[in-house]
Amino acid sequence: GYKGDLLRNYIGHKYKGLKIEYIENPVYDKTNNIYSLSLAKKELQKDDTLLIESDLIFDDTLFPMIVYNPYPNLALVAKYETWMDGTMVRLDEENNIVNFIPKKAFKYGDVDYYYKTVNIYKFSKEFSTTNYVPFLEAYTKALGNNEYYEQVLRVITLLDKCELKALPLQGEKWYEIDDV
């Protein structure tokens, strides 16, 4: 994607013994993140996945928070504040995500119920294989590649048994730097 060469040169192919693989989206300027993620669908089905958007800065404690949480399918979220923009979610009393609210469906009258997606997710191999990737393929086939991957999660929350939970932050710092 955008400035991908700079990123690869800066990070390299290994970090502290961890192998880093890159998936190139050559049409990043004509597609959205749903297409970039669809390019990685084989990798999503090989193992558990941490999905982290590249335009984030965040407190180091967020990684262990999500990695060591016992729930296999998790989204980090933060209680809505006025500076937040983008996809929101609504939760039930057990922190199950019951709806993803895209920017165009945002209602100021509902802000007391909104949590902003931090855009750090954990998906189990099973969730990716049986839920996310099949819906990702159907969604892109029906609606194209200029959409957001959260829209697929929105569809999944409509299932009778959605296995995606939220982990609300408790004051940990994060910010989307594309808004700076």
Please report, for each region that a protein language model flagged, where it lies by residue:
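Cofactor-binding loop segments of dinucleotide-utilizing enzymes, especially the Rossmann-like FAD-
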Residues: 1, 54, 78
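Conserved N-terminal catalytic core of the sugar/cofactor nucleotidyltransferase
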Residues: 1-47
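Conserved beta-strand segments of alpha/beta enzyme cores
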Residues: 19-21, 96, 163-165
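Short beta-strand-to-loop acidic/aromatic patch adjacent to the donor-nucleotide binding site
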Residues: 47-57
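Phosphate- and divalent-cation-binding pockets in alpha/beta enzyme and binding domains
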Residues: 6-9, 61, 152, 176
